[in-house]
Amino acid sequence: QAMREFQPALPLGVALSGGADSTALLIACAARWPGQVVALHVNHGLQSAAARFEQHCRGLCASLQVPLRISKVDARHQAGQSPEDAARIARYKAFEALALTEYAQPAIKSIAIAQHADDQVETLLLALSRGAGLPGLSAMPHRWERGGLAYCRPFLRVSGADIRRWLGEQQVAFVEDPTNTDVRFTRNRIRAQILPALQAAFPQFRDTFVRSASHAAQAQELLEELGAQDAQAVCGEDGHPRIKALQALSRARQANVLRYWLRNSYGVAPSAAQLQELQDQIAACVTRGHRIHIKVGQGFVQRSAVKLTWYNP
């Protein structure tokens, strides 16, 4: 069912790690669109099994007669950055380089990633544990665009167990990631301890959790549309919001347009505490001499005459 609903722009790149999920995705895509699929493998070099993953990918692609493009990256994390974030950033940069290189034929238009319903539930639970808003509760999108490519996750409504069951029926081998059982990682603890408990209490939890994330994503889209409309109304030609125009909005609508302005103009997101303080200062701004200077992200929002500006010192 998931593959029947999947209609990517072709040619298609498939992100292939060598694990069960990406192995299944490549086999399914290669069978459906022969001659239109390219496998993309990123070797992070972060674990001893990296060479085994790459070897499996080479053998699988040879058996399927699917072209394989490989990128070796330095995914070591910087200070203040999680290993997962560093690996993800390096991986997407590599995907873009592999897909868009002028020497690569065919020219890839879409990239499919094999994250599934269990991954989506884990992402949603992590967002809930952080007290995330709608962007976090939307979890992972089914489809998005980045760097001139369309990315897709066709397995987001399919359980990991169903994928492995299908691979078993096909008698296809894959490589087990040795880090998946390391409970020092939060995702692995969720997978090993929380998901089985949810399965016992609520057997349909994958479907309902994924549906909730979809509802949150739709609500976030509406807030984005409203934010764009309000930003056009409250911001001058210079793109900075006018304080009096902000004061005329309800507090919820004001918070939304401030988030929209900061994210789209500067790529920063205020914390809940920072946003509340900023709104309190906007409400109190009734005299010419009232000063606003609040830290947001790596910079500051400040009052400049009748408007707000953000700067990074």
At which residue positions do the language-model features occur?
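Core alpha/beta nucleotide-donor-binding catalytic domains of modification enzymes
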Residues: 1-192, 196
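AMP-forming adenylation/ATP pyrophosphatase catalytic core
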Residues: 1-20, 33-44, 73-77, 90, ...
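Electropositive, surface-exposed helix/loop patches at the edges of structured domains
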Residues: 102-118, 208-226
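Short secondary-structure boundary micro-motifs
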Residues: 111, 156-157, 198-199, 283-286, ...
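Alpha-helix boundary/capping and short turn/kink residues
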Residues: 130, 134, 160, 199-203, ...
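A general boundary/transition motif marking the beginning of the first structured unit of a protein
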Residues: 155, 182, 197-204, 245-250, ...
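Mid-to-C-terminal catalytic subdomains of enzymes
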Residues: 164-214, 218-221, 299, 306, ...
